[in-house]
């Protein structure tokens, strides 16, 4: 159905119009237009519904004709003219004179309502807005609706109510096209794939960024990292005067004339810049002689010296320390002295523990070898060999109770006379020798070693051509090695107890040998010279590795039961840990002792190792070696063992671990053997 004119007019009646609540009227007081509330919105309805509504307006704006008659043309056309349009008679309408800044300032000062006047450029007149219009403008500037009675966010009214209805708005079933792949999309994909394969569609390759950098510059100085180019760096402030520049210093701070004369003999950079003097009062202080010079030097520094910002990193010193486990979690380890073995009259130079840990043997410079019972500390056997015992080693086999002792220049094999009868019989059988065994090498006139029966002690004496320093057993107990430091090609010798045979495997060594030890499980042989450790393969007769210690002189060496780690002690108090799988250089270097390290040793069962020194101390460390090759060994210092006294400048001469318990034996120059337990 269509609407008639009357119906259309009724839709725009005063009841439906947003302006029905008010009317436009002339404001006599203000001389302008204002919007007033009529309060007759409810009575504006027509009693006759079919009567056409007539729009009426009380505004005088519709009655006043526009004063400008130029029409709808740009005002720029009359910008430089004296008139603006023409009147009905054709005369020019002159522009009103604009007031200057002084007149406008005076009018603002005199008229309090002048801020509400607006210049109408189209009609060339000033219009004063009312308070209501000012409020409307203020609301528009704030982004609000012009009138307060308009609600911009009315309550939402849901016109559709599903409750109580029998049918929904739409209950059509889902179309089949939503479940079936699109055939047209498949064709488009096939076309795109074919075009990509044939090269019709080419993708843009990613741009390669230049991988250049400043070779001699700092990354912080690049233009990319700077904000708005060069940043201002304030100049450093000059140093403030200190107490030394006091005009009335204490007498002890005033230098004498001799000290002042001695300053002239010093270099200029070392010479003090200010000499304190004493004055009665502050007004007696003369002008500073170097004020002009120092001011000029500072100006040169500010003008010529470049300034850079140095980033200071505040690092907590505690965070730099390695995180080590607590000592309580690493127990047991030797901490306190449990027992003392006394009986020697001279410094105890060497120790050796029996394979089961029941007996311990000690050798002293008083010419005696003693065997002690570990649990009771009772001495059960004493041999007076008549010479200084430099080294002693117990056979590692449990059924071979044989002691190898370096006495003066030669090596003595003794029956320890401990154990059951079967072990005694086997030990005596190994120490039997029928005739003189002289082993001669090819081309040598003199034998390297003579195996001689020692009738007094019912043992064997191995007579070397030069003095022997150390002796070490193979882990099976049949082979042992001796080191003759000044023996040239015969410096390192290998001996076989069962065959009474000796030979020297090395024709030439790169340095003077200090010690030699066997690998605990493989056919490897370690020879320590003054600065290097050579690792040889006895089966292939070739050099495998050469470990560089970096110390002044090696004094002792020990092999980890796993065979892949080596510790070396030096005469400058350093202990080096080598991880042979990692590098030929030390993994860790520990500087704990103030004097020479006399011996280093590993524990066979526990992750412990120790070092003894002539400073009368023995250090115990936790050394855990992991089966994972990606994890480095863990080294933790545990305890410093003290108790030995110094004799002739010497302290602890040897240290050995118990084979089964976390106990440590130490031999001191004070003729005492100490046992440290947990």
From Swiss-Prot:
InterPro entries assigned: BOP1/Erb1, BOP1_N_dom, WD40/YVTN_repeat-like_dom_sf, WD40_repeat_CS, WD40_repeat_dom_sf, WD40_rpt
Compartments, record wording: Nucleus, Nucleolus; Nucleus, Nucleoplasm
PROSITE patterns: WD_REPEATS_1 (PS00678), WD_REPEATS_2 (PS50082), WD_REPEATS_REGION (PS50294)
Record keywords, A-Z: Nucleus, Repeat, Ribosome biogenesis, rRNA processing, WD repeat
Species: Oryza sativa subsp. japonica (Rice)
Family: Belongs to the WD repeat BOP1/ERB1 family.
Top-level taxon of the source organism: Eukaryota
Name used for this protein in its record: Ribosome biogenesis protein BOP1 homolog
Chain spans, region Disordered: 1-73
Comp. bias intervals (Basic and acidic residues): 1-10
């Amino acid at each position: 159905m269509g609407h008639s004119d009357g119906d259309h007019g009724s839709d725009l009646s005063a009841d439906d119009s947003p302006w029905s609540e008010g009317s436009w009227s002339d404001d006599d007081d203000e001389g302008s237009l204002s919007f007033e509330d009529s309060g007759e919105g409810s009575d504006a309805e027509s009693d006759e519904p079919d009567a056409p509504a007539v729009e009426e307006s009380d505004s005088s704006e519709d009655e006043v004709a526009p004063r400008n008659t130029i029409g709808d043309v740009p005002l720029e056309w009359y910008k430089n003219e004296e008139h603006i349009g023409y009147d009905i008679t054709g005369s020019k309408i002159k522009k009103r004179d604009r007031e200057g800044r002084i007149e406008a300032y005076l009018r603002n000062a005199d008229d309090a309502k002048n801020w509400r006047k607006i210049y109408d450029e189209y009609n060339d007149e000033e219009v004063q807005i009312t308070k209501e219009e000012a409020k409307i403008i203020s609301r528009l500037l704030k982004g609000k609706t012009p009138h307060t009675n308009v609600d911009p966010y009315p309550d939402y009214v849901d016109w559709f109510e599903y409750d109580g209805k029998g049918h929904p708005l739409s209950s059509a079933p889902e179309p089949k096209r939503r479940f079936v792949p699109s055939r047209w999309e498949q064709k488009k994909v096939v076309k795109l794939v074919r075009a990509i394969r044939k090269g019709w569609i080419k993708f843009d390759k990613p741009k390669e960024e230049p991988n250049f950098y400043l070779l001699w510059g700092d990354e912080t100085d690049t233009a990319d990292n700077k904000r708005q180019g060069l940043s201002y760096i304030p100049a450093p402030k000059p140093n403030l005067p200190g107490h030394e520049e006091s005009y009335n210093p204490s007498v002890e701070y005033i230098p004498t004339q001799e000290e002042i004369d001695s300053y002239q003999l010093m270099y200029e950079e070392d010479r003090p810049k200010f000499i304190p003097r004493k004055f009665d009062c502050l007004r007696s202080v003369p002008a500073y002689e170097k004020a002009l010079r120092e001011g000029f030097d500072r100006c040169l520094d500010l003008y010529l010296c470049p300034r850079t910002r140095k980033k200071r990193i505040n690092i907590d010193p505690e965070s730099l320390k390695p995180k080590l486990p607590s000592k309580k979690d690493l127990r047991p380890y030797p901490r306190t002295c449990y027992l003392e073995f006394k009986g020697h009259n001279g410094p105890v130079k060497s120790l050796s523990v029996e394979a089961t840990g029941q007996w311990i043997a000690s050798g002293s410079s008083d010419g005696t070898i003693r065997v002690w019972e570990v649990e009771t500390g009772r001495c059960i056997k004493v041999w007076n060999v008549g010479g200084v015992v430099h080294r002693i080693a117990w056979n590692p086999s449990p059924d071979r109770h044989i002691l190898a002792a370096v006495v003066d220049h030669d090596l003595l094999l003794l029956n320890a006379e401990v154990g059951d009868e079967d072990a005694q019989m086997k030990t005596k059988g190994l120490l039997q020798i029928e005739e003189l065994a002289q082993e001669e090498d090819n081309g040598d006139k003199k034998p390297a070693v003579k195996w001689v029966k020692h009738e007094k002690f019912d043992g064997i004496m191995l007579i070397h051509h030069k003095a022997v320093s150390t002796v070490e057993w193979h882990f099976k107990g049949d082979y042992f090695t001796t080191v003759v430091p000044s023996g040239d090609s015969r410096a390192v010798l290998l001996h076989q107890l069962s065959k009474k045979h000796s030979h020297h495997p090395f024709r030439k060594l790169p340095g003077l040998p200090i010690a030699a030890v066997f690998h605990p499980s493989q056919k490897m042989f370690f020879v320590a010279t003054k600065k290097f450790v050579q690792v040889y393969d006895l089966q292939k007769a070739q050099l495998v590795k050469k470990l560089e210690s970096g110390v002044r002189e090696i004094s002792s060496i020990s092999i980890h039961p796993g065979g892949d780690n080596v510790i070396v002690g030096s005469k400058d108090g350093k202990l080096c840990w080598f991880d042979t799988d990692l590098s030929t250089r030390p993994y860790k270097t520990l500087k704990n002792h103030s004097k020479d390290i006399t011996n280093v040793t590993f524990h066979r069962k526990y992750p412990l190792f120790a070092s003894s020194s002539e400073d009368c101390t023995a250090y115990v460390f936790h050394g855990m070696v992991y089966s994972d090759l990606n994890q480095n060994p863990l080294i933790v210092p545990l305890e410093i063992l003290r108790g030995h006294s110094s004799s002739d400048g010497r302290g602890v001469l040897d240290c050995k671990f118990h084979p089964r318990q976390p106990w440590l034996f130490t031999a001191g120059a004070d003729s005492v053997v100490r046992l440290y337990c947990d």
